[in-house]
Amino acid sequence: ISYIYTSPSSYLHPIRWETTIAESGHGVALYDVLTGKQWNDKDKTMFKNPYSQFVKLETDFTKTWTRDAVSKLVGHINAGIIYSYGNSDWLPNSEMFYVGGANSLRAFPVRGVGPGRFPGYGDKAISYLMQNGDIKFVCNLEYRCQLFGSLHGAFFFDAGNVWNFDEDYDDADARKVFADSKFSFSRFFNDLALNTGVGLRYDLDFLILRLDWGIGLHMPFDTGKAGYFNNN
């Protein structure tokens, strides 16, 4: 299920809001119940393969403040939550949230931050698979101005992270590694990775070409550098 609202094109300060709700496994689980199985039974299968049950909610909000004909300020918030239940203790990796890259935290690589204060593994291939979470929050603020013709400059600021619902791992080593990966309101602002940067935009009318350069300001885990601005 998806809901999209876009302001009329005549608005000086337009907004765009998109919210999506998705679920998996509910219909199959209901069939299992009707055929005699218990709702909370684990390891139920469909065609001899276990299936996942989860609900996923994601929302994306963008507002543009038009200053004049050649400059604007754009604010963007992207947040999501996914919850497993019933047949599932774990979520499919492909459905979990991650941050980093050109569309979220532009100074960090894809899956380069989180969950929470998790610093990542030395083995980047393993770390790539583990740096995702059940909860996501990303916000961006970008000022754009025309340089000449179709070429525009941009100055941006990004903040965000992903978190887990809990740290209830059966394996003791996993509990140690993912300590502080759980979402906490009291740590929320300190858990946000921050970056800033500059970029270029070339408007082809049907497509905008982007080039960004970002630098990290704050990492949510211990980097060995003192102070809030601890990126090294």
Give the positions of each predicted feature:
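C-terminal outer-membrane beta-barrel translocator/porin domains of Gram-negative envelope proteins
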Residues: 1-145, 155-159, 163-185
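Residue-level detection of beta-strand scaffold positions
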Residues: 143, 154-156, 199-201, 208, ...
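Short hydrophobic "helix-edge" motifs at membrane interfaces and signal-peptide entry regions
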Residues: 147-149, 195-196
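Flexible, small/polar- and glycine-enriched "cap/hinge" segments at structural transition points
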Residues: 158-160, 165, 197, 201, ...
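Strand-loop-strand
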Residues: 174-204, 229-231
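Predominantly the C-terminal beta-signal and adjacent terminal strand-loop region
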Residues: 205-232
